[in-house]
């Protein structure tokens, strides 16, 4: 359950219908085998931990949605694209992605789905590169916390073109139920 008062971004009203991109069946030439799909999705989390987009195969038109809100290429949230956000260290406040569990990989549609935990200790130095100055951030950004996430990736031609995440805040260091 994503609630506006708990999440950094929340537009549950925009989650009523699946985005058409996720239903599209890929041509044979656009597909990746299951193990490659999981490796590509996992590179996203490696990129978060290492603060670089260099190791993540982002499609030039990649977009990410968090709790229904478009969090890339969107001037009202963060104007930068997927790769640019990583290269600009926008996620440097996330220090660990743990309990990674990939539950589904669909070669025909290029989808990977899993559940994960992001750890955010809330230390000022972790926000050095964040687009908003630390003293202007809402408390929810720098309060020590973890996020339980379910994320789905659309991968076409070996590149991540779309990411859909649903998340909820939990106490920092919370254990997973999986």
Predicted segment positions?
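C-terminal and inter-domain tail/linker signature
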Residues: 1-178
């Amino acid at each position: 359950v994503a609630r506006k008062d708990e999440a950094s971004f929340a537009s549950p009203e925009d989650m009523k219908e699946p985005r058409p991109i996720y239903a599209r069946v890929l041509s044979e030439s656009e597909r990746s085998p299951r193990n490659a799909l999981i490796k590509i999705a996992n590179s996203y989390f490696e990129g978060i931990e290492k603060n670089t987009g260099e190791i993540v195969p982002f499609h030039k038109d990649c977009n990410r949605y968090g709790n229904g809100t478009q969090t890339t290429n969107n001037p009202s949230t963060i104007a930068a694209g997927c790769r640019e956000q990583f290269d600009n260290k926008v996620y440097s406040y996330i220090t660990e992605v743990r309990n990674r569990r990939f539950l589904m990989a669909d070669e025909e549609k290029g989808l990977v789905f899993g559940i994960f935990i992001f750890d955010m200790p809330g230390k000022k130095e972790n926000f050095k590169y964040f687009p908003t100055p630390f003293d202007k951030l809402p408390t929810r950004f720098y309060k020590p916390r973890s996020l339980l996430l379910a994320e789905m990736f659309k991968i076409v031609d070996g590149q991540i073109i779309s990411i859909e995440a649903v998340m909820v805040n939990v106490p920092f260091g919370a254990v997973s139920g999986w």
